[in-house]
């Protein structure tokens, strides 16, 4: 062992799994599920009874949390589904670049410059207008399965 100090910056999730297994029958409305390799929020769950051939089935209707598309899946209720690790983090908005990227201030005082403005028109307008008026804005960033996107905005007053 050397006496040198080893420092590294953790930029990723250190190889942790992006999902965890959960039995289909225990996933509820408002929960999350992975359908077609996309992180989704469950908006409707219906179960069918055990039939002549096999298991009771769960029918999931879910909305992709990043692009808003509706996805559906049918899974036997005893089988495991992938559930994404979904995190929300608040950052203070520092700047908006001309190419559509935002500069955000993290809790430890560093800047995060790798996020684009959201594609949701209403949210995009709120952010641009609020920033143009010189308000202090805090954006909520949702991250799941290696994707990140601004999903909400809070006004914490004038600068």
From Swiss-Prot:
PTM: Lys-52 undergoes hypusination, a unique post-translational modification that consists in the addition of a butylamino group from spermidine to lysine side chain, leading to the formation of the unusual amino acid hypusine. eIF-5As are the only known proteins to undergo this modification, which is essential for their function.
Pfam families in alphabetical order: eIF-5a, IF5A-like_N
ATP-binding in keyword set: no
Domain of life: Eukaryota
GO biological process: positive regulation of translational elongation; positive regulation of translational termination
Gene Ontology MF terms: ribosome binding; RNA binding; translation elongation factor activity; translation initiation factor activity
Keywords for this protein: Hypusine, Initiation factor, Protein biosynthesis
Entries under Gene3D superfamilies matching the protein: 2.30.30.30, Nucleic acid-binding proteins
CDD domains associated with the record: S1_eIF5A (cd04468)
InterPro entries per the UniProt record, alphabetical: IF5A-like, IF5A-like_N, NA-bd_OB-fold, Rib_uL2_dom2, Trans_elong_IF5A_hypusine_site, Transl_elong_IF5A_C, Translation_prot_SH3-like_sf
Region (Disordered), start-end ranges: 1-23
Modified-residue entries (Hypusine), positions: 52
Biased composition, class Basic and acidic residues, residue ranges: 1-12
NCBIfam families linked to this entry: eIF_5A
Function: Translation factor that promotes translation elongation and termination, particularly upon ribosome stalling at specific amino acid sequence contexts. Binds between the exit (E) and peptidyl (P) site of the ribosome and promotes rescue of stalled ribosome: specifically required for efficient translation of polyproline-containing peptides as well as other motifs that stall the ribosome. Acts as a ribosome quality control (RQC) cofactor by joining the RQC complex to facilitate peptidyl transfer during CAT tailing step.
Family, similarity comment: Belongs to the eIF-5A family.
Protein name: Eukaryotic translation initiation factor 5A
Organism: Senecio vernalis (Spring groundsel)
Gene: EIFSV1
């Amino acid at each position: 062992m050397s006496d040198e100090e080893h420092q590294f910056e953790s930029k990723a999730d250190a190889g942790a799994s992006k999902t965890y297994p959960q039995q289909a029958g225990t996933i509820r409305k408002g929960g999350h599920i992975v359908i077609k390799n996309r992180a989704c929020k469950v908006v409707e769950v219906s179960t069918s009874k055990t039939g002549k051939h096999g298991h009771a089935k769960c029918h999931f209707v879910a909305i992709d949390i990043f692009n808003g598309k509706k996805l559906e899946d049918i899974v036997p209720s005893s089988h495991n589904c992938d559930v994404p690790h979904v995190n929300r983090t608040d950052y203070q908005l520092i700047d908006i670049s001309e190419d559509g990227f935002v500069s955000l201030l993290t809790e430890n005082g560093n800047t995060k410059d790798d996020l684009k403005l959201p594609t949701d028109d209403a949210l995009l307008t709120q952010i641009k207008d609020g920033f143009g008026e010189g308000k202090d804005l805090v954006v909520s960033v949702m991250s799941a399965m290696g994707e990140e996107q601004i999903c909400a905005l809070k006004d914490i007053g004038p600068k």
